[in-house]
């Protein structure tokens, strides 16, 4: 039986628990190194080194996603720990369901430091039937139906974690007022990211 680690809130096996402290509150995630080892190593190393401290969520689209991780706050910046953009790590076990922690990119194999958290509350009915027909696993289609998500990003953006606590904070961030280019009018910042060993 295939394991879909995003469908439970326990920290199992190699999974890593982290708390993202923001000026809107905390969000707790579990990271999935078995699914996306290189991506998780990149994120955890950046977090431990304070790379994300003080960095904003520079792009917020309510009922879609909130994006951060760019020290320049332009959407053009950020880099990986590897010194160059690194490859996508797609999996048949991880999907862009509501609360997924996923890598932003500028096309295939262009991962750096930017990430987004999926915040779409409802997947249209017509899309759900397409998922079932398109080979998405039944438990994942069910999760999309019950909690929402962005299935069209599956196999296009690397999913490497899942929100397990702090939905209110995510919704609060998503509901902020934005200006041009979906940039919040008032900075929403990551104060720090704590790895819970």
Curated annotation (Swiss-Prot):
It comes from the Bacteria. GO terms for biological process: protein folding. GO terms for molecular function: peptidyl-prolyl cis-trans isomerase activity. It catalyses: [protein]-peptidylproline (omega=180) = [protein]-peptidylproline (omega=0). Residues 14-195 form the PPIase cyclophilin-type domain. InterPro entries: Cyclophilin-like_dom_sf, Cyclophilin-type_PPIase, Cyclophilin-type_PPIase_CS, Cyclophilin-type_PPIase_dom, Cyclophilin_A-like. Its EC number is 5.2.1.8. It is an enzyme of class 5 (isomerase). The keyword Cytoplasm does not apply. It holds the Pfam family Pro_isomerase. The keyword Transcription does not apply. Keywords: Isomerase, Rotamase. Disulfide bonds: none annotated. Belongs to the cyclophilin-type PPIase family. PPIases accelerate the folding of proteins. It catalyzes the cis-trans isomerization of proline imidic peptide bonds in oligopeptides. This is Putative peptidyl-prolyl cis-trans isomerase. It comes from Staphylococcus saprophyticus subsp. saprophyticus (strain ATCC 15305 / DSM 20229 / NCIMB 8711 / NCTC 7292 / S-41).
